[in-house]
Amino acid sequence: TWNIINANIFKEKNKCKHDIIILSSKDELIERKLDEFRPDYIFFPHWSYLIPNDIVKKYKCIIFHMTDLPYGRGGSPLQNLIVRGHTSTKISALMANEDLDAGPIYMKANLSLEGTAQEIYERASKIIFEEPVNPGSFCFHHI
């Protein structure tokens, strides 16, 4: 919910120049719906699932990953960083491609790993929506 709250705050602050979809569950990622909507971008903040290659090839999919990529590629990045004793990391924004967390990186922003997991995720969400990949104006749509 904190992700959607921050997405809605960001939406209210910006005029629409691009249509962007923010997906928060795997059930929302339906190619037929995407084909009807034809988004300019699809943002995947805190996404835990593989994105189907058909969607990656057809749309500009931007993933936000909670490590200083290429370090930490793969699943459970927050848990893996904490287990390894890290106290800070970076949020990396990258274009999805057919390889896991390996596309071109557009942005990196510092993220403290101090506090509870909830506090860390809330800070990460604020970074994602306050420092977007393309600092123009966006319009967020939910499917």
Regions found by a protein language model. Name each.
Residues 1-13:
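N-terminal beta1-alpha1 ligand-phosphate binding loop
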Residues 41, 45-143:
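Donor/substrate-binding cores of folate-linked one-carbon enzymes
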Residues 11-15, 98-99:
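Short, conserved catalytic or adaptor-binding loops enriched in Gly and charged residues
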Residues 1-2, 24-26, 45-46:
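Structural motif
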Residues 19, 38-42:
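Short active-site oxyanion
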Residues 17-29:
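A short beta-strand-loop structural module common to alpha/beta enzyme folds
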Residues 6-7, 30-31, 50-53:
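Short, well-ordered alpha-helical microsegments
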Residues 30-38:
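Short amphipathic alpha-helix with an adjacent loop that forms part of the alpha/beta core around
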